[in-house]
From Swiss-Prot:
PANTHER family: MITOGEN-ACTIVATED PROTEIN KINASE. Gene3D superfamilies: Phosphorylase Kinase, domain 1, Transferase(Phosphotransferase) domain 1. SUPFAM superfamilies: Protein kinase-like (PK-like). It catalyses: L-seryl-[protein] + ATP = O-phospho-L-seryl-[protein] + ADP + H(+); L-threonyl-[protein] + ATP = O-phospho-L-threonyl-[protein] + ADP + H(+). InterPro entries: Kinase-like_dom_sf, MAP_kinase, MAP_kinase_CS, Prot_kinase_dom, Ser/Thr_kinase_AS. It is an enzyme of class 2 (transferase). It comes from the Eukaryota. The TXY motif contains the threonine and tyrosine residues whose phosphorylation activates the MAP kinases. Activated by tyrosine and threonine phosphorylation. This is Mitogen-activated protein kinase mpkC. Dually phosphorylated on Thr-171 and Tyr-173, which activates the enzyme. Mitogen-activated protein kinase required for growth on media where sorbitol or mannitol is the sole carbon source. The active site is at residue 141.
Length: 415
């Protein structure tokens, strides 16, 4: 049976397998706490996210199942990848992912990025979205804090807690207001993957501007800021508003003309502004897709259609509308852990230590009469929201160490 070690991280108890050493607090993520740790098998520093009270209610258990399933099945260079997953004796779910140095929110820190960095980051976001959308998944909560970046400028999308299926009719949701597409604010019953492309436009503008483009104080002020830049929404957009009161208010708004983006981004390249013009479009039917964005002239230095893969199959959303009891969701989560364990143990072993670890976990499983011992597995990957003191100097990309409390994380220093 695998050994679990208890640690206190940000006031909460972490129960991790002996595979992980030197746990250090990173911060609070969505519905969980994140720490860094040294993986004794891979000899890499990783991120471990504890999902708080995953079996507290049916809604929380369903969200936990959705995130675990998504992270298990979505594999792409520009998405955070899960390396391990386990369920502790206290029945908390732990997701283990790669650890990147910072996120875009911290990197910006109130300052614009050089155009070349904004360009490369935008390319990677679009490349990741092309894959996600091809799998029939919408992220729904893209924002700078959900875009992780390392010292080589590699970008990975994380936090799939709000991800949903692309379906003809969808309800509203709570996302970060600054990056929320207008069709969400206008209470459309129908929206699709283009909500993510609106978010990309807001993020690109923020990288060039150094501050949020639409920093609304509430949803009304948010919409006002959007119309102040883009003008009034066209009639075909207004006609699709399903709430009579909202439609009446939007129709009664004073006439506003669109302002040129050059007015607020005078130093931006024309090609970058043109891409923004195609992303920040009221009508999602006229907003470009991720694939079209990759083919935009501003993406030409990086665009390679042979290296922008799509998913090999659609993600299975058959569970999404299921109204199941808590115990059933719990069993389904354990099943995902088991499947992950079987795949990893059938994969090529990485040395004697890894093989011994797999054998130990297998013995823990087969000797158990309770699914609880699925916790002996290593489950992995969830969203990562790094809130630690990592810094990257945009002028010195490629030579930056991960920082924690001002100290470089040197794997050789772990014992």
């Amino acid at each position: 049976m695998a050994e679990f070690i208890r640690s206190d991280i940000l006031g909460t108890t972490f129960e991790t397998t002996s595979r992980y050493a030197n746990l250090q607090p990173v911060g609070l993520g969505t519905a969980g706490v994140v720490c860094s740790a040294y993986d004794l098998i891979s000899e890499q520093v990783v991120a471990i996210k504890k999902m708080m009270k995953p079996f507290h209610s049916t809604s929380v258990a369903k969200r936990t199942y959705r995130e675990v399933k998504l992270l298990r099945h979505l594999r792409h260079d520009n998405l955070i990848n899960m390396s391990d997953i386990f369920i502790s004796p206290l029945e908390d779910v732990y997701l283990v992912t790669e650890l990147l140095g910072t996120d875009l929110h911290r990197l910006l820190n109130g300052k614009p990025l050089e155009s070349k960095f904004a360009q490369y980051f935008t390319y990677q976001i679009l490349r990741g979205l092309k894959y996600i959308h091809s799998a029939g998944v919408i992220h729904r909560d893209l924002k700078p804090g959900n875009l992780l970046i390392n010292e080589n400028c590699d970008l990975k999308i994380c936090d799939f807690g709000l991800a949903r299926v692309q379906e003809p009719q969808m309800t509203g949701y709570v996302s970060t207001r600054y990056y929320r597409a207008p069709e969400i604010m206008l209470t459309w019953q129908r929206y699709g993957s283009k909500v993510d492309l609106w978010s990309v436009g807001c993020i690109l503008a923020e990288m060039l501007l150094g501050r949020p483009l639409f920093p609304g104080t509430d949803h009304i002020n948010q919409f006002w800021l959007i119309t102040d830049l883009l003008g009034n929404p066209p009639d075909e957009v207004i006609d699709r508003i399903t709430t009579n009161n909202t439609r009446r208010v939007v129709k009664s708004m004073a006439k506003r003309n669109p302002r040129p983006l050059k007015e607020i981004l005078p130093a931006a390249e024309d090609a970058a502004l043109n891409l923004l013009d195609n992303l920040l479009v009221f009508d999602p039917d006229r907003r470009i897709s991720a694939e079209q964005g990759l083919m935009h002239p501003w993406m030409a230095p990086y665009h390679d259609p042979t290296d922008e893969p799509v998913a090999t199959e659609q993600f299975d959303w058959s569970f999404n509308d299921a109204d199941l009891p808590l115990d059933t969701w719990k069993i389904m989560i354990y099943s995902e852990v088991l499947d992950f364990f079987q795949l990893t143990t059938n994969a090529e072993p990485s040395g004697e230590q890894s093989q011994n670890q797999s054998q130990s976990q297998s013995q823990a499983f087969t000797s158990s009469q309770d699914l609880q011992l699925a916790s002996m597995l290593n489950l992995g990957e969830g969203e990562l929201l790094p809130d630690f003191a990592a810094t990257i100097d945009p002028n010195k990309f490629g030579s930056v160490d991960y920082l924690m409390d001002g100290q470089s994380l040197d794997p050789n220093s772990f014992s």
